[in-house]
Amino acid sequence: MGYYSLTEVTAVQYAKEHGYFEKKANVVCHEIGDGNLNYVFKLDDGEKSIIIKQALPYAKVVGESWPLSIKRATIESKALQIFAKYVPEYVPVVYSHDEELAVTVIEDLSRLTITRKGLIDGEEYPLLSQHIGRFLANVLFYTSDFGLQSEEKRVLEGTFVNPDLCKITEDLVFTDPFGHYDTNDYEPELQLTIDELWSDKTLKLKVAQYKYKFLTRKEALIHGDLHTGSIFSSPSETKVIDPEFATYGPFGFDIGQFIANLLLNALSREEEQRGVLFFHIEKTWSYFVETFTKLWIGEGVEAYTKEKQWLPIILQNIFTDAVGFAGCELIRRTIGLAHVADLDEITNKETRIQAKKQALSLGKELIKYESKNADIQLFRTLFQQTVSGGIKA
């Protein structure tokens, strides 16, 4: 019968028809999605629960005037299955995928908390950086030319051509926040700071280079939208979700996005509460390097992985890219179309504006920084130089 949008009623019907619940089961269903592109339903009969996610043929945040291909749901499902091949402990189980309806049935992770919400609430996740560092190292290594034979990599790359969502990234991360575009969204009090940002030709030249890297460097399979709202956490578990932006791209992209979102949370905190965020930023990189290095030495299939001087160059390039991509993410999450609650939910207006100005300044510094070595202390140093004192709630 072709594609149709599910409702809470038809989601239950779908689940029963596909054997997830008995026909007579009393299934409670709620639409729980808070994202911009999908419906997400939680179904529970008191004994078991599942999540049904359906891609919409348009962006919810804009409406039907912004059409999107529902094929992204297939890309998301395939990405989760690729991730599970290498790091099953860090992703939800995919039970099934229906390409015609753009429906994926996945494990219910209600026992966990969306990491962004948890961090805003002051929750601590001691294993977050270890898990994300290892997740990134495994996925990026094993889907790159270093972990896959070149012909296998080319075939896999072809299955993750994702034009609609890549175009969103190109526009909303690298283009629109750096000029006069209707998609931008910001308080009038930021206008002078933004005018200065938009007139900075050196900054724009650097952003152009990072955008070009995103467009042309097909180094590994990236999640494409790895912010703290795309991660479920508890003190002992971490699960990466929502890879519908997955595509082949630069090694450093996901790392930069994740770090940027930790920095955004740090900006919302008082000075004495920021240490845990810098701990996670620095540990994410150290666990990434440790794991990537072990894989390089033990699992490398490309001939030049045997050259000892090649790995440090690769890691330096990844770090340099991560720094710049983090800067772009900071700016776009502050004045672009899709904001973050870390800043927007600061209740005091003066404090909120201050934090957003600091986010813009820090983003600019990260984009323009010329890193000579992979010094993970850089994020802490530039943060301290850019942000004087603490945020007062």
Swiss-Prot record:
It is an enzyme of class 2 (transferase). ATP binds at N38, K53, E107, D108, L109, D242, P243, E244. Pathway: Amino-acid biosynthesis; L-methionine biosynthesis via salvage pathway; S-methyl-5-thio-alpha-D-ribose 1-phosphate from S-methyl-5'-thioadenosine (hydrolase route): step 2/2. GO terms for molecular function: ATP binding; S-methyl-5-thioribose kinase activity. Pfam families: APH (PF01636). GO terms for biological process: L-methionine salvage from methylthioadenosine. The keyword Nucleotide-binding applies. Its EC number is 2.7.1.100. InterPro entries: Aminoglycoside_PTrfase (IPR002575), Kinase-like_dom_sf (IPR011009), Methylthioribose_kinase (IPR009212). It catalyses: 5-(methylsulfanyl)-D-ribose + ATP = 5-(methylsulfanyl)-alpha-D-ribose 1-phosphate + ADP + H(+). Substrate binds at D225, R332. Transmembrane segments: none annotated. Keywords: Amino-acid biosynthesis, ATP-binding, Kinase, Methionine biosynthesis, Nucleotide-binding, Transferase. Belongs to the methylthioribose kinase family. HAMAP family: Salvage_MtnK. Homodimer. Catalyzes the phosphorylation of methylthioribose into methylthioribose-1-phosphate. This is Methylthioribose kinase. It comes from Bacillus anthracis. The gene is mtnK.
